[in-house]
């Protein structure tokens, strides 16, 4: 499926489901098998610790999205997507430095991005 999307000209590939470490979680292995160079599988950010980012040889990014992106107000994907969309090729260091400020406090109401999350 990933290679079909690339052949169709996708500029960004998003995969979700099965991003944990359970034996039957196949998405990370599928992304790796597609030929992507994995930058990170895991980030010091909650919600979203099981985020995966990779790049194909032509620079096309691929993200493995944990389930939290469907329900949480702000996640690692909210921190990474603007930079990916701007054409910035993120590195492992870009994620490791997110450890400070990487915990969403789940404030009600959510005021992200006007809060310390991801800063």
Q: What positions do the PLM features span?
A:
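Short glycine/threonine-rich loop/turn motifs
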Residues: 1-117
């Amino acid at each position: 499926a990933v290679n079909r999307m690339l052949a169709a000209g996708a500029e960004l590939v998003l995969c979700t489901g099965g991003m944990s470490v359970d034996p039957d979680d196949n998405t990370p292995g599928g992304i790796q098998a597609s030929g992507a160079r994995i930058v990170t599988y895991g980030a010091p950010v909650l919600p979203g610790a099981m985020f995966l980012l990779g790049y194909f040889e032509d620079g096309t990014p691929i993200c493995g999205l944990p389930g939290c992106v469907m329900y949480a107000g702000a996640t690692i994907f909210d921190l990474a997507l603007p930079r990916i969309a701007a054409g910035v090729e993120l590195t492992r260091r870009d994620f490791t430095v997110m450890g400070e400020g990487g915990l969403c406090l789940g404030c009600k109401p959510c005021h992200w991005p006007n809060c310390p999350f991801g800063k």
